[in-house]
Amino acid sequence: MFQDNPLLAQLKQQLHSQTPRAEGVVKATEKGFGFLEVDAQKSYFIPPPQMKKVMHGDRIIAVIHSEKERESAEPEELVEPFLTRFVGKVQGKNDRLAIVPDHPLLKDAIPCRAARGLNHEFKEGDWAVAEMRRHPLKGDRSFYAELTQYITFGDDHFVPWWVTLARHNLEKEAPDGVATEMLDEGLVREDLTALDFVTIDSASTEDMDDALFAKALPDGKLQLIVAIADPTAWIAEGSKLDKAAKIRAFTNYLPGFNIPMLPRELSDDLCSLRANEVRPVLACRMTFSTDGTIEDNIEFFAATIESKAKLVYDQVSDWLENTGDWQPESEAIAEQVRLLAQICQRRGEWRHNHALVFKDRLDYRFILGEKGEVLDIVAEPRRIANRIVEEAMIAANICAARVLRDKLGFGIYNVHMGFDPANADALAALLKTHGLHVDAEEVLTLDGFCKLRRELDAQPTGFLDSRIRRFQSFAEISTEPGPHFGLGLEAYATWTSPIRKYGDMINHRLLKAVIKGETATRPQDEITVQMAERRRLNRMAERDVGDWLYARFLKDKAGTDTRFAAEIVDISRGGMRVRLVDNGAIAFIPAPFLHAVRDELVCSQENGTVQIKGETAYKVTDVIDVTIAEVRMETRSIIARPVA
């Protein structure tokens, strides 16, 4: 008798519309219950039985119940699932398989089966890629996943690499394909094979894409020719190899090995500027005045060179610093190194006075054994030879940026606009509290930004610099010329790494059009989106593999008294993140390790400080001594404790 009763339907509708609801993201805990986080201030409790319907990270709409002044959330509708495609470890065997996602807050095994056509007999411990097929909030009885790809077996020493690449859906191998002959591009190539070009790289580098030749001019000026490998002499635009490079966008450098953007035959041989091998190049000839200014007579041209020596960073640095036993193989090579060091000095001073120079930071290198085990992690300071190459490349990229801007009006540019205008007033207010007075309008200009950066660099510590980082905008890849505030330059377009960056290949083709006096087509904006996304994924992959290797390396230090110097890099409500100075590992110090009485402890991300009983005990950029309390291999996280 109640069926199809319009009054009852109306009442139901009324009750539904009057019931309070909230949309937010599910945050799981290790205790079975969870929270629906609506925003930074508001969250609702989700009881354990209701948590069975959702997963950590799901965006949902929930009904809010109030009982005895306590509010709780009942999940009702799925807005966006947290898991779609994921990697994990397989449990069980044969017909009863489950997969545990590789995520710190997802501990439950999800029932699954292998996709049709996947020819692998899955067993306990295997790593796999899976896709979610069922979700309780979609009307399904339970969660269910389908295994779509076998990654590797559980005991594979190279799990960190294969799992990480699969997680980010990145290629595992070099692209297929061969380039048999050079294209006829209608370019006249200048024969520079007689000149003493040199390359300076790491000892292990195979994909050398830049060679340098310097010359002193009679009036005290210095001339530099930067010769860059020429893959677009082999790869036609729109060809199969070009399309593959466009998708990859970059060579992916991971600890221990790289996955190249181009076939290895090209990247490590045909295009690589190997010593005593004749190679086609795209070159730029530039002149520096006595104060390091790049003069206006910039010239881009096609050429043929033969590198006369493959030099190694550390050996060149040692020789210039009068240490070590390495000697250049001839006086001609020695003269090149001396002239390049002079250019480096001039350009460094020019950039210091007229642009911005990044502070030197350590690079960390993993030394790996045959089975991917970490034998050591070495800190490599940036030395004079690294700076020689860096100054030459920056100068060459400034030249390309100017030529492309003036001749074409477009290219692939690296653009960084400094501070977000919406943050200018907050930035000025923060700096004022630290005794630095800036004009909120001026700081948004290139000159104003450079002026502030120089003042910050003159500060005794990097604390204030760390505070204002959150107000900065991100660097972008753009087809429009624009300033690069981070470098303090009016325009910056890279073309010096075409073996490893697709954007540099595009700029090569545009520069060749300029050389030939032809018109060129503006690159499509979609390519900049693809490049930015690939750069993001490659960086995440490098970080993920690094985290795994750091956890392996420090595992046997857990619970010991071994001390490490550590710089505080971030402070949050839950504790502090620190970077171990000797090896670059990131570790977390939970708040209870800082002070036992929670009410007397204030960890402020806003201020970058930890206060105990009202006194500042720690701040970002402080260097403290820590020991390793625990290494959690399943989450690749390192927990540290301050030395009392």
From Swiss-Prot:
It catalyses: Exonucleolytic cleavage in the 3'- to 5'-direction to yield nucleoside 5'-phosphates. Residues 561-643 form the S1 motif domain. SMART domains: CSP (SM00357), RNB (SM00955). One of its GO terms (biological process) is mRNA catabolic process. The keyword RNA-binding applies. Keywords: Cytoplasm, Exonuclease, Hydrolase, Nuclease, RNA-binding. One of its GO terms (cellular component) is cytosol. It is found in: Cytoplasm. Pfam families: OB_RNB (PF08206), RNB (PF00773), S1 (PF00575). It comes from the Bacteria. InterPro entries: CSD, NA-bd_OB-fold, RNase_B_OB_dom, RNase_II, RNase_II/R, RNase_II/R_CS, RNase_II/RNase_R, RNR_Ribonuclease. Its EC number is 3.1.13.1. Residues 189-516 form the RNB domain. It is an enzyme of class 3 (hydrolase). One of its GO terms (molecular function) is RNA binding. HAMAP family: RNase_II (MF_01036). Involved in mRNA degradation. Hydrolyzes single-stranded polyribonucleotides processively in the 3' to 5' direction. Belongs to the RNR ribonuclease family. RNase II subfamily. This is Exoribonuclease 2.
